[in-house]
Amino acid sequence: MSSNPFNPFEAALNWQRKTLENMTDAAETSQIADERLELMESVEVGQTPSDVVYEENKLELLHYDAEATGIEVAEEDKEAVPILIVYALINRPYILDLQEERSVVRRLLEAGHDVYLIDWNEPSRLDQHLTLDDYVNRYMDNCVDVVRERSGQDAINILGYCMGGTMSVMYTALHKEKVNTLGLMAAGLCFDHTGGVLEEWGSEEYYSPQDVVDTFGNVPSDMLDIGFALMDPVENYVTKYIRFAENMENEGFVENFGRMEQWLGDGIDVAGEAYVQFLEDVYQDNKLYKNELELNGKHVDLDNIDMPVLQLMGEYDHLIPPEASKPFNDVIASDDTRTIEFSTGHIGLSVSSSTHADLWPEVAEWYSERSTGGEEVDIEVESPEDDTVDQSESTDIEVDATDDVDADATEDDADAADEPADVDSVSGIGPTYAERLHAAGIHSVADLAEYDAAELADIAETTESRAQDWLDQL
C-alpha cells in the first residue's frame, strides 16, 4: 500500500488553489486584452519599398527598391537577370513580404537579385469572363516583356507560388525563349489522387465549379476562405485562438498573429471563367500533367520546359501535398531539375523563421548560379491592347572543345557506345515513364522502336503525341 494515503481535504485545497491561480491569470490577461487587440490591428505588412512600373486592368507590376529598403549590395554581387514573382489569383501577395525578418522579397534583394512581383488585385464583375489565356498569354506575357525591357535581358527568372506556380508552368511552356529559370513554390501540378483533401473536394463527383460561377459570376473570397479553413477546422477555429490566449503577454507573438490574421482575412474574389478552367482542366482532368492542356487552342507543351527548374514544397502542406508537385519533374524536358522538400506547411514556406534561415539563402544561390546574364537586347513592349510582342533572338555561343582527350576515357566511351541505349536516354522520358516502360519489358531504345505511339502511350500512361515525340527521336 502507498505510504501516502489519499487525503480528500488536501485534494480539495489543491483544486481550490489551482482554480484561484487560473482566475488570477485570466484577470491579469483580461487587463491587457484590449491593448493586445489594438496592437493586432495596428501591425503593418508589405513594407518593402516598391514602385508600380506597369499597370493593366486591375494588375500592378511592382519593382522592389533595394536601396530605399536600406539593403546594400556590392556592385559585383548584383545579379543581371531579374526575378519575376508570380503570385496566385487567390489572397494578397504580401504573404511574401509579411515583415522584415520574414520577407521572401527581402531575402532575394539581400542576395543581389532584382525583384519584380505581379499583384493581380481584385477582379470586378466585368472581369468574370477572363480566362487562363488572358492571365497567362496576355497579362503575364506583357509583364515579362516589361521586365525584359527594363533589365535588358532576353530571358528572365520566374518564381511562381501556389496557383501562380501552375500558371508559370503554362507560361514557360508557351514562351520558353523568355524564361531563363523556373522556380516553383508549392505549385499544384499533378492531380492523380495525389492532391489530398482539396483534390477530393474538387472532384467532379462532388463539385461543379461552373455552378458556382453561374450563381456568383466571380468566385467569392469568403467561400474560398471558409473552404480552406475547413480543411483543418480544429486548428483554424479552436487551437490557434487558445494559443493566442496563452501567449497574449508576448507582444512579438501578438504582432505575428495579427499579421497572419490580416492576410487570412484579406482574400480576393477569383475571375469566374479562369476558376472554372483551372478546376476542370488542372484539378479534375489533370490535363497539365498529362500534357494535354490547351489555352485558346495553343498546346501547353511540357516538352518545351528545358531550362533549369527548382521545386520548393512543404512536407506538411495540406493544400498542395508534395505528391502533387514531385512527379512534374519527370514529365518535362529539363535535365537540370531540383526538388527541396522542407519541414513546413504551405504558408510556412514563405513566413516560417526556419525557411528564412535555411531555405531562402539556398534558393537565392540557386538562381545566382544560373543567372550569368546574356547579351543585352532591346525589347519592344506593346500596349496593353495588343496580345503579342516582338521577340529578339537569343545569342548562340560556340565553345571549342579541347583536343586533349584521355585515351582510357575514349576506350570507355567506345565500349559504352556498343551497349544498347536505355529508354531514359530519350528526351522526355524521365524516371517515372522509364519505370513504367521497364515494367513492360521495354529497356532499350531498340525495344522502344518496336512499338507504335498508341501502344507506348497506353504502357507509359501518357498521350500519343508525347509517345510519338519519343519515337521521332529514334
Curated annotation (Swiss-Prot):
The keyword Ribosomal protein does not apply. PHB and PHBV are desirable bioplastic due to their biodegradability, biocompatibility, and mechanical properties. However, PHBV has better mechanical properties than PHB. Its EC number is 2.3.1.-. Pathway: Biopolymer metabolism; poly-(R)-3-hydroxybutanoate biosynthesis. It is an enzyme of class 2 (transferase). Residues 82-348 form the AB hydrolase-1 domain. It comes from the Archaea. Residues 375-404, 410-422 have a biased composition (Acidic residues). Residues 368-404, 410-429 are annotated as: Disordered. Disruption phenotype: Depletion of both phaC and phaE genes leads to complete loss of the PHA synthase activity. One of its GO terms (molecular function) is nucleotide binding. The keyword Chloroplast does not apply. The active site is at residues 162, 317, 346. It holds the Pfam family Abhydrolase_1. GO terms for biological process: poly(3-hydroxyalkanoate) biosynthetic process; poly-hydroxybutyrate biosynthetic process. InterPro entries: AB_hydrolase_1, AB_hydrolase_fold, DNA_repair_Rad51/TF_NusA_a-hlx, PHA/PHB_synthase, PHA_synth_III_C. Keywords: Acyltransferase, PHA biosynthesis, PHB biosynthesis, Transferase. Involved in the production of polyhydroxyalkonic acids (PHAs), which are water-insoluble biopolymers used as intracellular energy reserve material when cells grow under conditions of nutrient limitation. PHAs are composed primarily of 3-hydroxybutyric acid (3HB) and 3-hydroxyvaleric acid (3HV). Required for the production of poly-beta-hydroxybutyrate (PHB) and poly(beta-hydroxybutyrate-co-beta-hydroxyvalerate) (PHBV). PANTHER family: POLY(3-HYDROXYALKANOATE) POLYMERASE SUBUNIT PHAC. Belongs to the PHA/PHB synthase family. Heterodimer with PhaE. This is Poly(3-hydroxyalkanoate) polymerase subunit PhaC. The gene is phaC.
